[in-house]
UniProtKB/Swiss-Prot annotation:
Coiled coil: none annotated. Beta-alanine binds at residue 61. GO terms for molecular function: ATP binding; pantoate-beta-alanine ligase activity. It comes from the Bacteria. (R)-pantoate binds at residues 61, 155. ATP binds at residues 30-37, 149-152, 178, 186-189. GO terms for cellular component: cytosol. Pathway: Cofactor biosynthesis; (R)-pantothenate biosynthesis; (R)-pantothenate from (R)-pantoate and beta-alanine: step 1/1. It comes from Shewanella baltica (strain OS195). It is an enzyme of class 6 (ligase). Keywords: ATP-binding, Cytoplasm, Ligase, Nucleotide-binding, Pantothenate biosynthesis. It catalyses: (R)-pantoate + beta-alanine + ATP = (R)-pantothenate + AMP + diphosphate + H(+). Catalyzes the condensation of pantoate with beta-alanine in an ATP-dependent reaction via a pantoyl-adenylate intermediate. This is Pantothenate synthetase.
Length: 281
């Protein structure tokens, strides 16, 4: 696998593949990779002739009191895992490469509406940071296909909306959430959990599953939401949000809606965990 922190190197290699009529898939990450990321890379390899990955801990998407400095950097292990999964080109830029004028003087990409609810309400500016860095990476790599995990459901919809609104010729593919045996969604932030917290953490998925089951049986949104929140609190979580939304727009779900998604974020110990369930009724 070729690794470079320089934009020109990435563009040169991709152009060489393009000159031979070959296709390119892209998997952007922040590193500290787990099996969910590896699944994205393997899926990417099945879609295109070549796979490009990136590792960049993006300061623009972290808030003032968030874990930017504490976010684990594990480049050597990540590189080995990416190579084994089928990535051929790895882009590892520094903040100076991506934001040479600094964050305050950087042009931003902002997706209105969908960026301002749920995680966007809890983390103001987060999705502006996500949309900006992903747009920049798309312009550098210019892939045919880009893959993202369904665990970050709101992020996936933000990126799909950005690609559609800006007429970017890229297919965005969401890949099913990879879970531990307990049902806990794999996340780089699971490393913050103590043994006791990790044992309690599967309650997040269990609460979401119970909500969906009740809604399918005709129970009210409000009743199932309150029951699920109570279960989370009993398990040691502090809920940030737990909501039922329209699956395509993330607008508040209405009783007549069929395409639904339950989205949750909750704190346990030092970790803020997110999960979701997309379903029809």
């Amino acid at each position: 696998m070729i690794t470079s922190a320089h934009i020109d190197d990435i563009r040169t290699q991709v152009r060489a593949w393009r000159a031979k009529g070959e296709t390119v898939a892209f998997v952007p990450t922040m590193g500290n990779l787990h099996q969910g990321h590896i699944t994205l890379v393997k899926e990417a390899a099945s879609k295109c002739d070549h796979v490009v990955a990136s590792i960049f801990v993006n300061p623009m998407q972290f808030g003032q009191n968030e874990d930017l400095d504490a976010y684990p950097r594990t480049l050597a292990a990540d590189s080995e895992a990416l190579t084994a999964a089928g990535a051929e080109l790895l882009f590892t830029p520094t903040p100076a490469v991506m934001y040479p004028k600094g964050l305050e003087q950087q042009t931003y990409v902002e997706v209105p509406g969908i960026s301002n609810v749920l995680c966007g309400a809890s983390r103001p500016g987060h999705f502006r940071g996500v949309a900006t860095i992903v747009c920049k990476l798309f312009n550098i790599v210019q892939p045919d296909v880009a893959l993202f995990g369904n665990k970050d459901y709101q992020q996936l919809l933000v990126i799909k909306t950005m690609v559609e609104d800006l007429s970017l010729p890229i297919e965005i593919i969401g890949v099913d959430t990879i879970r531990e045996d307990s049902g806990l969604a794999m996340s780089s932030r699971n490393g913050y959990l103590t043994a006791a917290e990790k044992a309690a953490a599967p309650a997040l998925k269990q609460a979401i599953d119970a909500m969906a089951a009740g809604i399918k049986q005709g129970e009210s949104f409000e009743q199932m939401t309150e029951q699920a929140k109570a279960c989370l609190v009993a398990a040691g979580f502090t809920p940030d949000y737990l909501e039922i939304r329209h699956a395509h727009t993330l607008e508040q779900a209405q009783n007549q809606d069929h395409a639904l998604v339950i989205l949750a974020a909750a704190y346990i110990g030092k970790a803020r965990l997110i999960d979701n369930l997309r379903f029809d009724r």
